[in-house]
Design a protein with these regions (language model features):
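Ribosome-associated RNA-binding proteins
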Residues: 1-140
Length: 140
């Protein structure tokens, strides 16, 4: 990795092992994402659907009411911010990997189920719906 002026160059080393040489593209994309994240924050948008489901931001934490007896609190790591609007949760930050990890942890709290479609899903995620017992019995 070389920095010349305002440009960063990632060049494969001479005579290095093939395993190290194969990581060249990985390092290039990691550095590129770090630079891109500083200028434009990365964000993931999650939507939730279900009876009584709601979310609220409390400081740097996110409180989710997902039909359990107690609300679920997701701690926001340093550099991650939450924005809640109606049934949308926006996770944003400068670290692409951390934004994706936090969004996955939120989704894990109540994955979308295929019969009614209730749960937490990514905004553009398509949930394949299944026919229920009544629909399956009527078709038979």
């Amino acid at each position: 990795v070389q920095v010349q002026g305002e440009e960063v160059f990632v060049k494969p080393g001479e005579g290095l092992a093939e395993e190290i040489d194969s990581l060249w593209g990985l390092y290039r994309s990691l550095i590129s994402n770090m630079v891109k994240g500083v200028f434009t924050q990365f964000e993931k948008v999650l939507t939730f659907q279900g009876v009584g489901f709601r979310a609220a931001g409390k400081g740097s934490d996110l409180e989710l009411h997902l039909g359990f007896t107690n609300p679920v609190t997701v701690k926001g790591p340093v550099g991650i911010s939450f924005k809640v609007e109606k049934n949308k949760i926006t996770v944003s930050g400068i670290d692409k990997e951390l934004v994706g990890q936090v969004a996955a942890e939120i989704r894990k709290q109540r994955k979308p189920e295929p019969y009614q479609g209730s749960g937490i899903k990514y905004e553009k995620e398509i949930i394949i719906r299944k026919a229920g017992k009544k629909a399956a019995a009527a078709a038979a």
